[in-house]
Swiss-Prot record:
The keyword Transferase appears for this protein: yes
Keywords assigned by UniProt, alphabetized: Glycosyltransferase, Transferase
Purpose of the protein: Catalyzes the synthesis of Und-PP-GlcNAc-ManNAcA (Lipid II), the second lipid-linked intermediate involved in enterobacterial common antigen (ECA) synthesis.
Pfam family, one: Glyco_tran_WecG
Pathway linked to the protein: Bacterial outer membrane biogenesis; enterobacterial common antigen biosynthesis
Enzyme class, first EC level, given as a word: transferase
Protein name: UDP-N-acetyl-D-mannosaminuronic acid transferase
Entry keyword Transferase: yes
Reactions catalysed: UDP-N-acetyl-alpha-D-mannosaminouronate + N-acetyl-alpha-D-glucosaminyl-di-trans,octa-cis-undecaprenyl diphosphate = beta-D-ManNAcA-(1->4)-alpha-D-GlcNAc-di-trans,octa-cis-undecaprenyl diphosphate + UDP + H(+)
GO MF term list: hexosyltransferase activity; lipopolysaccharide N-acetylmannosaminouronosyltransferase activity
Organism lineage: Bacteria, Pseudomonadati, Pseudomonadota, Gammaproteobacteria, Enterobacterales
Family: Belongs to the glycosyltransferase 26 family.
UniProt GO BP: enterobacterial common antigen biosynthetic process
Length: 246
């Protein structure tokens, strides 16, 4: 990334979305030549935006995060409609996580993993070490009690992790990251949902051609028809789009 490059932010329904040009720009901004940036990364798509509008607590969590990025093609198109000169690309959360892990492996950046089933987490750790020699300084599956949270925060702090990725689903992962950051602010936190499952092939992701066409949502719907109710809720976002209320 060129020195002094200013990355624009775009307001969509009150949420400030970073306008990253491409994956390389994201990586250079977060893991450039200096220390890893600290803060919280939150993937934004139409579904999460609508959920946040109906949930005051989640809305506050998201708006307090430092890095909101356009994870869904719906968000990219909304920004381009509202800001015709915007030059940004979709940054899929699963792809960003893998790119961060690869760069972390190259730079020896310490990483702590949270969430997922025990077997999936173990497979994720093994694959990260084998594939990119990632410096994993600790992990915790998603099966811990509320009483164990502070001890986990202490473990993360003691590990010296510079990147903490949390796979617990929304809004649990946003709540966890907020609370852990109060205890240990010296890391980059990223909520990754079901990314560990995809990375270890327990869940199949849409083929690249579907992703490139912006139809990953349709692929998931065809594979899991029970998602239809969730998809129908997105009609509200379509209304925002065509009525100029973005």
């Amino acid at each position: 990334m060129e020195p002094n490059t200013v990355i624009p932010k775009y307001n969509v329904r009150g949420f400030e979305i970073w306008g990253f040009r491409d994956m390389a720009q994201v990586l250079d901004h977060l893991l450039g030549s200096g220390p890893v940036k600290t803060g919280t990364l939150v993937a934004m798509n139409a579904e999460k935006l609508l959920k946040a509008e109906d949930d005051t607590a989640l809305c506050e969590l998201i708006k307090n995060a430092e890095y909101l990025y356009a994870d869904g093609i719906s968000m990219v198109r909304a920004i381009r409609r509202k800001y015709p000169q915007a030059e940004l690309s979709r940054v899929a959360g699963a792809d960003l996580w893998e790119a961060l892990m690869q760069r972390a492996g190259q730079q020896g950046t310490p990483v702590f993993l949270v969430g997922g089933k025990p077997d999936v987490l173990a497979e994720t750790e093994a694959k990260l070490r084998a594939q990119w020699n990632v410096n994993l300084v600790g992990s915790q599956d998603g099966y811990f009690t509320p009483e164990q949270r502070e001890a986990l925060f202490a473990r993360i702090a003691a590990s010296g992790a510079a990147i903490v990725t949390v796979a617990m689903g929304s809004p649990k992962q946003e709540i966890f990251m907020r609370d852990c950051r109060k205890f240990y602010p010296d890391a980059l936190y990223m909520g990754v949902g079901g990314t560990y499952d995809v990375f270890t092939s327990h869940v199949k992701r849409a083929p690249k051609i579907w992703q490139n066409m912006g139809l990953e949502w349709l692929y998931r719907l065809l594979a899991q028809p029970s998602r239809i109710r969730r998809q129908l809720k997105l009609l509200k976002f379509v209304g925002y789009y065509y009525s100029g209320r973005l």
